A protein has these predicted regions:
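Short, conserved beta-strand element in jelly-roll/cupin
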Residues: 49, 59-78, 115
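His/acidic/aromatic-lined binding-pocket segments of jelly-roll/cupin-type domains
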Residues: 55-57, 62-67, 85-86, 94, ...
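Ligand-binding loop in jelly-roll beta-barrel domains
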Residues: 87-89, 98-126
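Short acidic-glycine-tyrosine-enriched beta hairpin
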Residues: 78-98
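A short, N-terminal "cap"/entry segment at the start of jelly-roll beta-barrel domains
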Residues: 1-47, 54-55, 136-138
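Acidic/histidine-enriched, glycine/proline-rich intrinsically disordered or flexible terminal extensions
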Residues: 123-138
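Short, surface-exposed beta-edge/turn micro-motifs
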Residues: 42-43, 61-63, 109-110
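Short beta-strand segments in beta-sandwich/barrel cores
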Residues: 44-45, 53-55, 70-76, 93-94
């Protein structure tokens, strides 16, 4: 069965969450993000936020992140390498490799579409390197 999503309508339902931090709870994020549909072994999400997200990684596969509107800095850690900071903006897609820790800083706000595989792990602390903390699982 085909699934059709009207992304303009889905994003119009969301409110921009200002002041997001790595410790912002799911309840506090309500109304700023939405589960849109299942996809393969994962989920398609939409979100609108301003601030800084938590560190996360996905051991089951690569994550696709499309910047619908706005700009951000993507912090990413691959293997034993130092944290790399990469600017992203409207129209860009980032494919985050399986198991790579990553987070976004978006002080002026960003609208994202993500295709997230399977389970996720998080570090919900405001730290520079997630490898120094114990991850939480969803």
């Amino acid at each position: 069965m085909i699934t059709l999503l009207d992304l303009n309508a889905e994003f119009a339902k969301l409110n921009m969450l200002h002041g997001r931090t790595p410790t912002t709870t799911e309840a506090e994020r309500e109304g700023s993000s939405a589960w849109l549909a299942p996809y393969r072994d994962g989920t398609i999400f939409a979100s609108k936020s301003a601030g800084k997200g938590a560190w996360e990684r996905h051991p089951d596969g690569d994550e696709l992140v499309q910047v619908i509107e706005g700009s951000a800095t993507l912090d990413i850690v691959t293997d034993d390498n130092p944290v790399q900071s990469i600017p992203v903006h409207t129209g860009m897609i980032a494919i985050v490799p399986r198991g790579a820790w990553h987070r976004f800083h978006y002080p002026d706000g960003i609208t994202l579409l993500t295709v997230t595989p399977g389970k996720s792990e998080y570090v919900r602390l405001d730290i520079d390197d997630p490898r120094t903390a114990e991850p939480q699982h969803d």
